[in-house]
Amino acid sequence: MNIVDQQTFRDAMSCMGAAVNIITTDGPAGRAGFTASAVCSVTDTPPTLLVCLNRGASVWPVFNENRTLCVNTLSAGQEPLSNLFGGKTPMEHRFAAARWQNGVTGCPQLEEALVSFDCRISQVVSVGTHDILFCAIEAIHRHATPYGLVWFDRSYHALMRPAC
């Protein structure tokens, strides 16, 4: 069997563009958030998406206990916020850098997000170092900004909606 080494895998994955998201939670275990691009649709019946979270991440226990989350998809210009939530900055400083409102699950929704998906974690599957969080979507909030933000080739890229 041919096993692909970690660096080859990571280099190949850098060729797959993905939306940039800040995943947030709030509940009995506290408030937390992190930046993620490992997010995708699972099905529209019932509306479900998935988020991949490293079990070694400092935020993992908070998400594991709260069982709710909000996927906040960023728009162009929000790169500094992505970097803030992707680093070791204390949680209170991360959340102080933007305006938030509580979603139906109580999770923080970024007011200027391109779109926010307010979810309850319905199932968790462990694979390697990560948990795959299957998330039942309870509410969606869209913002009118025309610019998306993707992570591709290890850097940010702005996308604009077509005029037609």
Swiss-Prot record:
The keyword NAD applies. Belongs to the non-flavoprotein flavin reductase family. RutF subfamily. GO terms for biological process: nitrogen utilization; uracil catabolic process. Catalyzes the reduction of FMN to FMNH2 which is used to reduce pyrimidine by RutA via the Rut pathway. The keyword Flavoprotein applies. It catalyses: FMNH2 + NAD(+) = FMN + NADH + 2 H(+). Pfam families: Flavin_Reduct. One of its GO terms (molecular function) is FMN reductase [NAD(P)H] activity. Its EC number is 1.5.1.42. InterPro entries: Flavin_Rdtase-like_dom (IPR002563), NADH-dep_flavin_reductase (IPR050268), RutF (IPR019917), Split_barrel_FMN-bd (IPR012349). Keywords: Flavoprotein, FMN, NAD, Oxidoreductase. This is FMN reductase (NADH) RutF.
